[in-house]
Amino acid sequence: MLNIAVLVSGGGTNLQALIDAEKAGKIENGKISVVVASKPGVYALERAKNAGIEGIVLARSDYENVDAYSEALENLLKEKHTDLIVLAGFMTITNEKFTKAFENKIINVHPALIPSFCGKGYYGLHVHEAALARGVKVSGATVHFVNEVCDGGPIILQKAVPVEQGDTPETLQRRIMEQAEWKILPQAVSLLSLIHI
């Protein structure tokens, strides 16, 4: 059974998609055992509590620098015997030592079709603002492995979503979450859990 940690920084809608998929039996060989939040008071922790999943706050603000935070996070996840780390709206940077410690065990969902609108500065609404400014007709989401290059790891799954006339960054963000992120993130976790058997 794949021991899964989900890392969050906000409301946890992608976490909820994973919880729902697990409850529906769609993650056959995996279990979310812990949710780690990079700041206190985020709604994702309430979602974890409601699902009976341990929630831990490891606040980035409590650590002097990225290296200290990354080391604390690495130690916590090793203590929890984590097999797969899912970054689900985790807005905190970690260092290269962390990504190497969990090589091919960290995945991220990015709200665009990589290699478009990815890398440094492309997160949250910034991604959708850039897509609309560029005039693309299709955007979407990508689940990829995490390595030392921001949004540069191997792609696992992608799903395209049409950009509609009159879209705002907020409407495009919502459509991509509903039609792509909430679908392909659980699919990717399921695939990786089956490979883990």
PLM regions and their residue ranges:
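Conserved small/polar residues in nucleotide/adenosyl-binding loops
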Residues: 195-197
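N-terminal Rossmann-like dinucleotide-binding module
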Residues: 1-43
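Conserved acidic residues
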Residues: 33, 83, 104
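Glycine/small-residue-rich loop that forms an oxyanion/phosphate-binding "nest" at active or ligand-binding sites
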Residues: 67-77
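Donor/substrate-binding cores of folate-linked one-carbon enzymes
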Residues: 88-192
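Glycine-rich phosphate-binding loop signature in dinucleotide/nucleotide-binding domains
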Residues: 77-83
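Short, surface-exposed acidic-centric catalytic microdomains
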Residues: 29-68
